[in-house]
């Protein structure tokens, strides 16, 4: 099944990019050549780009801004005292604007406390091409966006620092080219890349893609970087000041390639686009979620890789090591590029709460143990029962294990936890045959497992807590047994 899945995924990617790398020549430069090889060639058609401005959250048509026609600024309700947020869509497989555009427009316009001008760069006629041709057109579209911003600067004294470009997929690189085409020492304020496109951009130099040099502040959300045949829909490499990789960035919860065949049977080849868009477009919905649920901001934490993050080793917010994903990110100037990871839910609101648990075991048996545990957490707001605990390796003598646990609810301050060794027929038999008598003072005790101390760190609040067994006279943990742990005054383990 795994091999068939790999093949189907590779075929999906080939169809997605429609490039000569998969044996589909498009009459342009071969796939894999960087943009520098084609940038001198003109696009296959005259640029057809519209700049639309939206008056309110229900506006679906927009009003067209025309550079060098100042009357359109008044007609479209442009307010020079408010920032300008421009949305830039990506490659198109059907020649239609995607429905998420109206969602993000509505979310931006509905924030009355932070009024902004909301616009759209409609380059659909240049995006509805073979992928390699659309890639070539991104530089031209970026230059046209820069021309619009320069005109606003000259005619309205509108500072480029008040501009925020939000680009999805190929649109992210359009944003980068717009920023780099502005000229002068001053840069536009912010660029947000929503799963910036990978094919023909991965591994290229900064001037051939979105990079931190293109704006005062650049952030990117990577949601579909899973590679097959050396290709990934979204770019994998960091390209911003803050690069967020939700759930590791390779794929997203709720998006299943295993359902591809079922979707094709039900919806035809359109199912291929739907399956890919689930993970690729998740970046957009995470950004919209940050606008619609400003009280439930997703927090990303700087980490070297997803494996370390999954062990809970990176929940540190010192020196800008954590930040909010999405619209309300803290914009820190002149920051060294940071790679951040986080876990999300499969649907909006996407926020989860991250906790690091460090559990100190003492194994009194001779061989490593791999039992199954669950933990119940009691907070000041909520209680969550029977969270499965996966250690990833056998328990050896006197060792501390670190793991990441995420909660869908805010439980408040953690005040007590219950740690249970879940029973199984195998472990019951093992326990009955290998237990031995140990003398401890004058009372007999059975050799087994002791959970000595549990250290907890809450990622979102940065609070550290230490928990010790409630009954210090009975430390042994046996199958089916549950131990209560309460806060104690031991020094938190770093």
Swiss-Prot record:
Annotated SMART domains: LH2
MF GO annotations: acetylesterase activity; acyltransferase activity; apolipoprotein binding; chylomicron binding; heparan sulfate proteoglycan binding; heparin binding; identical protein binding; lipase activity
Keyword Magnesium: no
Domain of life per record: Eukaryota
EC number assigned by the record: 3.1.1.3, 3.1.1.5, 3.1.1.32
Root EC class: hydrolase
Disulfide bonds: none
Activity regulation, per record: Phospholipase A1 and lysophospholipase activities are inhibited by annexin II.
Active-site feature positions: 169, 195, 280
Gene Ontology cellular-component terms listed: cell surface; early endosome; extracellular space; high-density lipoprotein particle; late endosome; microvillus
Gene3D superfamilies the UniProt entry points to: alpha/beta hydrolase, PLAT/LH2 domain
Signal peptide annotation: 1-21
GO biological process, one term: liver development
One Pfam family from the record: Lipase
Catalysed reaction equations from the record: a triacylglycerol + H2O = a diacylglycerol + a fatty acid + H(+); a 1-acyl-sn-glycero-3-phosphocholine + H2O = sn-glycerol 3-phosphocholine + a fatty acid + H(+); a 1,2-diacyl-sn-glycero-3-phosphocholine + H2O = a 2-acyl-sn-glycero-3-phosphocholine + a fatty acid + H(+); 1,2-di-(9Z-octadecenoyl)-sn-glycerol + H2O = 2-(9Z-octadecenoyl)-glycerol + (9Z)-octadecenoate + H(+)
Domain (PLAT): residue spans on this chain: 353-487
Positions glycosylated per UniProt: 79, 398
Essential for determining substrate specificity: region residues: 255-278
Alphabetic keyword roster: Glycoprotein, HDL, Heparin-binding, Hydrolase, Lipid degradation, Lipid metabolism, Secreted, Signal
Quaternary structure (record): Homodimer.
Similarity field: Belongs to the AB hydrolase superfamily. Lipase family.
Function: Catalyzes the hydrolysis of triglycerides and phospholipids present in circulating plasma lipoproteins, including chylomicrons, intermediate density lipoproteins (IDL), low density lipoproteins (LDL) of large size and high density lipoproteins (HDL), releasing free fatty acids (FFA) and smaller lipoprotein particles. Also exhibits lysophospholipase activity. Can hydrolyze both neutral lipid and phospholipid substrates but shows a greater binding affinity for neutral lipid substrates than phospholipid substrates.
UniProt protein name: Hepatic triacylglycerol lipase
Source organism per UniProt: Rattus norvegicus
Organism ancestry: Eukaryota, Metazoa, Chordata, Craniata, Vertebrata
């Amino acid at each position: 099944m795994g091999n068939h899945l790999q093949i189907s995924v590779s075929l999906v990617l080939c169809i997605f990019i429609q490039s000569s790398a998969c044996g589909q020549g498009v009459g342009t430069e071969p796939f894999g050549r960087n943009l520098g090889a084609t940038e001198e060639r003109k696009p296959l058609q005259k640029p057809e780009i519209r700049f639309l401005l939206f008056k309110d959250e229900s506006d679906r048509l927009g009003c067209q801004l025309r550079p060098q026609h100042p009357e359109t600024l008044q007609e479209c309700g442009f307010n020079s005292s408010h920032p300008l947020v421009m949305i830039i869509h990506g490659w198109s497989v059907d020649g239609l604007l995607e429905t998420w555009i109206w969602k993000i427009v509505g979310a931006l316009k509905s924030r009355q406390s932070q009024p902004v001008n909301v616009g759209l760069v409609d380059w659909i006629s240049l995006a509805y091409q073979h992928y390699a041709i659309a890639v070539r057109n991104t530089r031209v579209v970026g230059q046209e966006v820069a021309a619009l911003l320069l005109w606003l600067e000259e005619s309205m004294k509108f500072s480029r620092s008040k501009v925020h470009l939000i680009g999805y997929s190929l649109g992210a690189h359009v944003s980068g080219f717009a920023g780099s085409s502005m000229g002068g020492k001053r840069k536009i304020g912010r660029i947000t890349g929503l799963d910036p496109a990978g094919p023909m951009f991965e591994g290229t130099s900064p001037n051939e893609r979105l990079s931190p040099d293109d704006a005062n502040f650049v952030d990117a959300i990577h949601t579909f970087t899973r590679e097959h045949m050396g290709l990934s829909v979204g770019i994998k490499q960091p390209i911003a000041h803050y690069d967020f990789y939700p759930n590791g960035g390779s794929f997203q919860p709720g998006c299943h390639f295993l359902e591809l065949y079922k979707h094709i049977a039900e919806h035809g080849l359109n199912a291929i686009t739907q399956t890919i868009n689930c993970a690729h477009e998740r970046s957009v919905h995470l950004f919209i979620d940050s606008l619609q649920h400003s009280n439930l901001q997703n927090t990303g934490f700087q980490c070297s890789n997803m494996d370390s993050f999954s062990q809970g080793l990176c929940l540190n917010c010192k020196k800008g090591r954590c930040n909010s994903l999405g619209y309300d990110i803290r914009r820190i100037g002149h920051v060294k590029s940071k790679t951040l990871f986080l876990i999300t839910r499969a649907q909006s609101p996407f926020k989860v709460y991250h906790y690091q648990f460090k559990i100190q075991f003492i194994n009194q048996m001779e061989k490593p143990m791999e039992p199954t545990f669950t933990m119940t957490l009691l907070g000041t707001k909520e209680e969550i029962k029977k969270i499965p605990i996966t250690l990833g390796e056998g328990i050896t003598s006197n060792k501390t294990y670190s793991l990441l646990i995420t909660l869908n609810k805010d439980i408040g301050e953690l005040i007590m936890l219950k740690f249970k060794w879940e029973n199984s027929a195998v472990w019951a038999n093992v326990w009955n045959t290998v237990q031995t008598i140990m003398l401890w003072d004058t009372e007999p005790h059975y050799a087994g497992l002791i959970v000595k101390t549990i250290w907890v760190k809450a990622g979102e609040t940065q609070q550290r807590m230490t928990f010790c067994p409630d009954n210090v006279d009975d430390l042994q943990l046996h199958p089916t047994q549950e131990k209560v742990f309460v806060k104690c005054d031991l020094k938190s383990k770093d």
